[in-house]
Regions:
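Flexible mid-to-C-terminal extensions adjoining Fe-S/redox cofactors in radical SAM and related proteins
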Residues: 1-25, 262-303
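Short, flexible, glycine/charge-rich loop motifs used to bind or transfer phosphoryl groups or to couple energy/partner
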Residues: 29-31, 71-74, 127-129, 251
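Sterically constrained small-residue positions within well-ordered secondary structures
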Residues: 32-34, 75, 101, 131, ...
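Generic structural signal for well-ordered alpha-helices
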Residues: 70-73, 94-99, 123-127, 148-151, ...
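Radical SAM enzyme [4Fe-4S]-AdoMet core and its adjacent flexible, acidic
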Residues: 133-288
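Core AdoMet radical
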Residues: 38, 46, 56-67, 78-92, ...
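C-type cytochrome heme c attachment motif
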Residues: 49-53
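N-terminal [4Fe-4S]-dependent radical SAM core
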Residues: 1-42, 47, 58, 248, ...
Length: 303
């Protein structure tokens, strides 16, 4: 496996590999990071897909966040990873932004809905951006695994991960994806915006699907090349109960706000996570100033 970089962050040595794998090493009992290893960056609320459970309330008339003029982008450390939502219609300044991040050695991963991914113009854009090393990883939010030649098309793109939501994705969808050497990311269900409305009238469906995921997890893991989870899914699926202390230490990537945090370019705020009720204005802050605010709030027990 090709190594991209190794760097020191606080008391931790981080190594990045070509396939997206990240390793942390420290001689101390706990990892302590001076700067954020990664950020989840919401760049747009404009999307024509209309998912019933969208936690961000995206719509065709939603606004794009500006991608220029932010001091925190200018001050990001090399090899910081950012995950951005790439929706249709795309922001007009997305390509200059990707080139800017590339020059700063910031690693950009994108999430795109399957309906958009299957469009020829979107796949062409992604293919060219990946070839130029402007985008490292692609997360595809699943809508219908049986669509056209979806699975074979996905496998043409390196470092691609299928994103599914606990409570939304059905057993039939997962079964159809099994056995194709795919990577799967399971996200927790967020009861925000349309996600709350959907849960209010479909809570039985959501909870039954979460229970099914939890009970069939071993079989699901065996059906994919890699299965990973965000922190909310880890909580909803009670993953800590399945692991002993040593396994948990190796598996768990860290609490929200200790190694990563959330940035919303549409609203111009940042927070510990996208679920956090407490937000802070970005203003003219550097990335390290933002991360320090999040870490200090964690120490005080805020949020």
């Amino acid at each position: 496996m090709k190594r991209i970089a190794t760097y020191k962050n606080g008391n931790t040595y981080t190594t990045l590999y070509e396939d997206g794998t990240k390793e942390h090493f420290t001689m101390d009992d706990d990892f302590k990071f001076d700067f954020a290893e990664s950020c989840d960056v919401q760049i747009s609320q404009c999307c024509d897909n209309g998912c019933e459970w969208c936690y961000y309330g995206c719509s065709p008339t939603g606004q794009h966040g500006k991608l220029t003029g932010w001091k925190f982008f200018e001050t990001m450390h090399p090899y910081t990873e950012i995950a951005i939502n790439l929706q249709c219609p795309m922001p007009e300044d997305i390509l200059p932004f990707l080139w800017k991040m590339h020059r700063q050695k910031v690693i950009v991963n994108v999430t795109v809905n399957q309906n958009h991914f299957m469009r020829g113009d979107v796949r062409e854009f992604l293919g060219e951006a990946i070839a130029e090393d402007l985008i490292k990883g692609v997360g595809i939010s699943l809508t219908n695994p049986k669509q056209d030649d979806f699975i074979n098309i996905v496998k043409q793109y390196p470092n691609t991960v299928i994103h599914v939501i606990a409570g939304v994705t059905s057993p039939e969808d997962i079964d159809y994806l099994k056995g194709h050497d795919l990577k799967l990311l399971i996200l927790g269900y967020k009861k925000l915006e349309r996600g709350k409305k959907y849960y209010d009238h479909s809570s039985t469906i959501v909870e039954d699907n979460i229970k099914w995921l939890e009970s069939d997890l071993d079989e699901i893991i065996n059906g994919f090349k890699v299965v990973s989870f965000d922190n909310l899914a880890i909580e909803q699926l009670h993953l800590k109960d399945r692991l002993d202390e040593k396994e948990w230490e190796m598996f768990y990537g860290g609490d929200d706000g200790t190694v990563t945090f959330f940035i919303d370019l549409v609203k111009g705020v940042f927070a510990k996570s996208s679920l956090s009720p407490i937000t802070y204005p970005i203003g003219d802050k550097t990335i390290d100033e933002m991360f320090k605010i999040i870490k200090d709030a964690n120490k005080k027990g805020s949020d």
